[in-house]
Amino acid sequence: MTKEFHHVTVLLHETVDMLDIKPDGIYVDATLGGSGHSAYLLSKLGEEGHLYCFDQDQKAIDNAQVTLKSYIDKGQVTFIKDNFRHLKARLTALGVDEIDGILYDLGVSSPQLDERERGFSYKQDAPLDMRMDRQSLLTAYEVVNTYPFNDLVKIFFKYGEDKFSKQIARKIEQARAIKPIETTTELAELIKAAKPAKELKKKGHPAKQIFQAIRIEVNDELGAADESIQDAMELLALDGRISVITFHSLEDRLTKQLFKEASTVDVPKGLPLIPEDMKPKFELVSRKPILPSHSELTANKRAHSAKLRVAKKIRK
């Protein structure tokens, strides 16, 4: 891992080991990031195995081309610079119509958070950006300065689950009427000013939920995850597995619901046997989400909210 792209991988062994890797299998890392999961997965593949890695951040791919060089030289890795919502189309174009396993590490990566100019962090002053793909058009600046009041309230409440969404949106509306809100610090201060004093005494930064909400809107994170996970589940071969790491309740709720729908069936009352074509296509590998160990939590504070869910395809 290069110094410019330092990222501590969360739930490394659990996420990959739960995929039950076949040495000659075809696998996908839908969120390459710092390439930690990819490197560990590749170490389990034989010469016939292959890994397809997706990331919309060119810096992540540039970093992986260094850290995964030995596997690249053996022709075991293919990098795809794209949003993982296009996963099915991109894989199909490469002649891949079935995979043995796939993993997702959802949310923003540590290097993106730590790189000041990306504008993801409320702790560092930077232009309002928050794009995971630097070539996409919508930025946090546009959301904050051009979205109508009601849209801001909806986004803050839906994606940030902040009970002061209206007050914050009103404060933003008043400020931008005087001049555009241009930096993360300006926005964070407005959010703080919109909240009552007793709220500011609570643990955690007062701007955290709103920054999350804007980031999700800018990158359409939940829409992309929904599309991609459903497509991935279709692509899985029989006995193929999918591992999904989430970092907040919205991502976890989405993943849990998709897995539940695929692993359960509504059987009409009184039906003695479930017809084959009505049986669920998936089963949960673990009923409850897998959480980081105590030692991992001690070593990496960013792992504290991580949850891993895994499902296995049992019927085509």
UniProtKB/Swiss-Prot annotation:
| Enzyme Commission number | 2.1.1.199
For the biological process aspect of GO, one term held by this record is: rRNA base methylation
Q: What GO terms are given for molecular function?
A: rRNA (cytosine-N4-)-methyltransferase activity
Q: Where does S-adenosyl-L-methionine bind?
A: 35-37, 55, 84, 105, 112
> Which GO CC annotations does the UniProt entry carry?
cytoplasm
List the InterPro entries.
RsmH (IPR002903), SAM-dep_MeTrfase_MraW_recog (IPR023397), SAM-dependent_MTases_sf (IPR029063)
Q: Which residues form the signal peptide?
A: none
The primary location reported for this protein is cytoplasm
Spell out the SUPFAM superfamilies in the cross-references: Putative methyltransferase TM0872, insert domain (SSF81799), S-adenosyl-L-methionine-dependent methyltransferases (SSF53335)
Compartment list: Cytoplasm
Key words, A-Z: Cytoplasm, Methyltransferase, rRNA processing, S-adenosyl-L-methionine, Transferase
Q: Name one Pfam family in it.
A: Methyltransf_5
Q: What reactions does this protein catalyze?
A: cytidine(1402) in 16S rRNA + S-adenosyl-L-methionine = N(4)-methylcytidine(1402) in 16S rRNA + S-adenosyl-L-homocysteine + H(+)
Its family remark reads:
Belongs to the methyltransferase superfamily. RsmH family.
**Functional description taken from the UniProt entry:** Specifically methylates the N4 position of cytidine in position 1402 (C1402) of 16S rRNA.
Q: Per its record, how is this protein called by name? A: Ribosomal RNA small subunit methyltransferase H
Q: Which organism is it from?
A: Streptococcus pyogenes serotype M1
